[in-house]
Amino acid sequence: MDYNSTRSFTMTLAHRAVGDTRRGGFRQLRNYVDMCATLAKNQQQKDFFAYAQKALQRTDSCYYSLIHRLLDSVDEDRICTVGVNMGFGGLIYGASELKKQADLEGQPIAWITAARCGDERLSELLPKAARHGSFVWLLDATDTDPAQVVLLAKANPQSAFGLLADPSALTE
């Protein structure tokens, strides 16, 4: 399957997982984590899901309240979009593309890119980076208006963004 088909399938699975977890509770979440652990291909993925399995074994795990709060307060589409953009786009597909490039060039390439908001080159850099497999960004807006991130996110819907900003600068 090509990137877009696989991403679309992954998004469908993410929506199903969120819905099942909302309806069936954390047992469903553990089932999905177990399934992903079984399907994990490389060692980093296996390690990640082994850690997730271990964290979810304890019924008093702090992750349960965090997940419950997330499911209660965040729109399902946003949960799935961020999860797919970061998980599939950034850590699976993107990381694999970046590794191929790094092997060719003989030097590692980061899977997350940090930049300052207000940099005029960002609107050109994001699509170019995505073509090479880089979909995850950390943008610093501590000295600028964070509104640019909204425009960048709308223009690059397959990327995931983290934002450093003064909370008082954020509005709906």
Regions found by a protein language model. Name each.
Residues M1-Y63:
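Long terminal accessory regions outside catalytic cores
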Residues T38, V150-L151:
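Short, charge-rich amphipathic alpha-helical segments embedded
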Residues V84-G89, R121-L125, P146-A147, E172:
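Well-ordered, non-membrane alpha-helical segments in soluble/globular domains
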